[in-house]
Amino acid sequence: MFKDEMRQTPNKPLPIAVVGEAILKQQAIEVRDFDDTLSQLASQMAASMVEAKGVGIAAPQVHSPLALFIMASRPNERYPDAPLMEPLVVVNPQIVLRSLQLEKGEEGCLSVPGQRFTIWRPQTIVVRYQNLAGQWQHSELTGFIARIFQHEFDHLQGITLLERSQMPEQKLMAQEGKPQA
């Protein structure tokens, strides 16, 4: 049913799931078919992200169980200081390495509308993912771009920003005011 709906409405924004919806608690499933349906989903996700003024969006946020997200950092009213990057479709992502250097930053989430959270995350990560053609890519990401990747990766693990903000390490770092070495 979901595939049929996408074929009928390419590039049409999809409804965004909000905290409390079951899809946001589920672990995403590996993408195995790199076909037009996947490309259409990515296109619709991008349209949803742009319409909502986001810098990233994960498939579970548009009610799809697939391990897929899009990052497209650009300055906008939600993130006026965001660096500009070309949209990047990330399929079946893995975080291979996380730096010990942590940094805190304000994050919002399209699935937790109207709220911002201070979140500590590794400043640099090394990642591996597939593109829309199924080819494996490797990248080292830093700063805000690394933050977007980790935020969207959380969605694929069934973790929303609300849950991330309540994790013990986040509370400890907030109390201390700095990461523990």
UniProtKB/Swiss-Prot annotation:
Binds 1 Fe(2+) ion. The keyword Metal-binding applies. It holds the Pfam family Pep_deformylase. Gene3D superfamilies: Peptide deformylase (3.90.45.10). It comes from the Bacteria. SUPFAM superfamilies: Peptide deformylase. Its cofactor is Fe(2+). The keyword Metal-binding applies. Fe cation binds at C109, H151, H155. CDD domains: Pep_deformylase. The active site is at E152. Keywords: Hydrolase, Iron, Metal-binding, Protein biosynthesis. Its EC number is 3.5.1.88. GO terms for molecular function: metal ion binding; peptide deformylase activity. It catalyses: N-terminal N-formyl-L-methionyl-[peptide] + H2O = N-terminal L-methionyl-[peptide] + formate. It is an enzyme of class 3 (hydrolase). GO terms for biological process: co-translational protein modification; translation. Belongs to the polypeptide deformylase family. Removes the formyl group from the N-terminal Met of newly synthesized proteins. Requires at least a dipeptide for an efficient rate of reaction. N-terminal L-methionine is a prerequisite for activity but the enzyme has broad specificity at other positions. PANTHER family: PEPTIDE DEFORMYLASE (PTHR10458:SF21). This is Peptide deformylase 2. It comes from Shewanella oneidensis (strain ATCC 700550 / JCM 31522 / CIP 106686 / LMG 19005 / NCIMB 14063 / MR-1).
